Amino acid sequence: MFLSCLSGGEISFAENGKAQCLIALPDKPTGFERDAADDLSSYLGQMTGAKFTVLPESKIPAGKSVIYVGQTNYARKQNIRFNQLSAEEWVIKATGSNLILSGGKPIGSFYAVWTLLNQFGCYCLTWDQDAVPNHKTLKREIRPEQSKPSFSGRFIYNRYPPILKYTQASAQVIQN
């Protein structure tokens, strides 16, 4: 099911360097859901200068705008059918002033977060180099999206892992 043609909603992430929303996780998040929320908080913070708080879904105060990351109860109530999503499939859906970034297990929610960050111009170029734009005020129209990678196993190896790099043999080994 592809939702990109539907209209979305405007979400205010930050205004003048101040966060306008909280980030919610399921009360018992998976490792990838936790990583996704941490990345979202970190990179939104780098972009806007704001501090984005991550809380368990059950600790979210009423009346706040929230980004729900992972397989939350809120997403379930908004008709996200987790059991119909493949392992890497993601869903992005605005609901009023809230945003759902969710997906199949194990890693779909992580891909939802990075799809959104990429839409904002945020990219991890290499292991130690990021491209992060500067937006003290960040408001965006968020169109609904449900997608998945064309194929699994999308790794690019541009060198040997560090453990396989040149190492020097000990003198004892060389002498024998």
Can you describe what each PLM-predicted range is?
Residues 2-91, 131-146:
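Acidic, contiguous N-terminal accessory segments
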Residues 36-39, 43, 61, 82-176:
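Feature activates predominantly on carbohydrate-active enzymes
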